[in-house]
């Protein structure tokens, strides 16, 4: 479950995806630290400065990722090859980033307090065409962890039982 907590790279990616200004992103980081502290990774829960600086670092990295990735072999050589490159050159963010982004959008960024989408669209975010038991189990874990409720035509629904083309409404409860 540790992968479900907000990390600096996650927040930087969300800020980048929503194209927030520096002031808006600073306000967002502060709101998350003050109001959503329980969802932050352990290393950030009691250290706003570390959270802020790490998110800024990763935001800068995302702005010029191609250049940083080109320079990484030289940096690795200078450090004697001891740096772990998985966080730097990996283009695949965690699948749970979708739910982190959804929760943050609903609470802090968007004007609406709900998001609607088809289950088929949600599956395509993960690269699936059909729902599997494992996917539904993971989906339910994320929904429960982030306190996100799903409803269909105003009634609470179970994502395992609805049709792929049903329009689901997501809300933070």
Predicted regions and their residues:
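Short glycine-rich, basic-tinged beta-strand/loop micro-motifs
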Residues: 109-130
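Short helix->loop/beta-hairpin flanking segments within DNA-binding domains
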Residues: 97-113
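Short terminal alpha-helical segments
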Residues: 1-23, 99
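Charge-enriched amphipathic alpha-helical scaffolds
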Residues: 35-64, 123-159
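Charged, low-complexity interaction regions
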Residues: 16-26, 34-43
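Long, low-complexity, charged/polar intrinsically disordered regions in eukaryotic proteins
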Residues: 41-97
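Structured alpha/beta or helical-core interaction and ligand-binding surfaces enriched in interleaved
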Residues: 22, 94-101, 131-133
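C-terminal edge-of-domain segments
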Residues: 155-173
């Amino acid at each position: 479950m540790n992968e479900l907590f907000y990390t600096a790279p996650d927040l930087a990616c969300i800020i980048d995806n929503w194209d927030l200004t520096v002031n808006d992103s600073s306000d967002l980081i502060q709101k998350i630290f003050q109001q959503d502290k329980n969802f932050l990774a352990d290393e950030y829960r009691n250290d706003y400065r570390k959270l802020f600086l790490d998110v800024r670092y990763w935001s800068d990295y995302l702005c010029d990722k191609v250049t940083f990735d080109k320079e990484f072999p030289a940096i690795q050589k200078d450090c004697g090859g001891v740096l772990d490159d998985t966080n730097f050159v990996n283009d695949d963010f965690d699948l749970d980033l979708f739910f982190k982004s959804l929760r943050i959008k609903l609470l802090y960024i968007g004007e609406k307090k709900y998001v609607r989408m088809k289950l088929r669209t949600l599956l395509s975010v993960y690269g699936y065409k059909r729902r599997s038991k494992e996917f539904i189990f993971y989906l339910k874990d994320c929904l429960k962890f982030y306190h996100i409720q799903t409803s269909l035509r105003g009634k609470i629904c179970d994502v395992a039982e609805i049709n792929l083309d049903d329009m689901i409404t997501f809300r933070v409860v």
